[in-house]
Amino acid sequence: IAVGKTFGHAQGAKIYAQKLSGLEGTGDSGTGIAIADAFDCIKGWHNAKSGANAGRPTVVNMSWGYNTTHNDLPSALNYQGAAKSGTDIDTLAELRTFKFQAYPGSSPYKTPNRVASVDADVDEMIDAGIHICHSAGNSYYTHDLTTGSDYNNTYTVSIGTGYYNRGSSPYSVNAFNVGNIDSTAYSSTQDQKRVDSVHGPAVDIYAPGTDIMSACSTTNNKSGQNYYANSSYKQVNISGTSMAGPQVAGIL
């Protein structure tokens, strides 16, 4: 999407991939790089660029994030400073009224979570001159800024209490936090976000991320089809902010 040789936005870019610890594929657990080490590697590589590469931008696209997993729905919320419990939040629809996004069949539930050390590492990369694109997520949640009325909303479940409208690490206010534009327009002159895209004041930009055709593995678990130009390769139609983020990364 970002750097494809035929349709990519940055066709002359060089691609480097990292396998991160905890994000490995099936059968290769324990083979990824620790996240802090991966970020240090990127920063060190960026700072050491010389010659013809010295003036080339470093753009990092990240499509992963932290969540807290819990099997139960909240017993209490604090929504914009007001306590909610009991019959206030005893249905999924009522929870969503207070911007806690739980949907039928989604147990175990996953709520976005921030990790301060990871966010600090992101800021260090940005301070070094690296451009960061982060896919905002597909969890329906509102992601608010520190000054917003939803930033301090909390939920309480059996494993503890957490914030639910602060988004997911890796995050920085100085990064590009990318939401997903739907493939169906709102009107003849306006686009609209996809319904499950994370949204809100902390989402900086939206890019096309629905019904995106891109390359995939010939042994992938998606519903791939033969690449139209060469049947030895595969392509797939897929949706999510993971498809939107690379659009921005490629433009940068």
What is each PLM-predicted segment?
Residues 1, 5-7, 11-27, 75-76, ...:
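Peri-catalytic substrate-binding/gating loops that frame the active-site cleft of hydrolases
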Residues 1-37, 50-59, 68-73, 127, ...:
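Subtilisin-like serine protease catalytic core
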Residues 7, 41-55, 113, 120-124, ...:
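Alpha-helix termini
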Residues 9, 14-19, 56-64, 131-135, ...:
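Structural recognition of the beta-strand scaffold that forms the well-ordered cores
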Residues 21-23, 65, 139-140, 182-185, ...:
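Acidic glycine-/aspartate-rich tracts in secreted/extracellular proteins
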Residues 43-113, 135:
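Short acidic, glycine-rich surface-loop motifs adjacent to enzyme active sites
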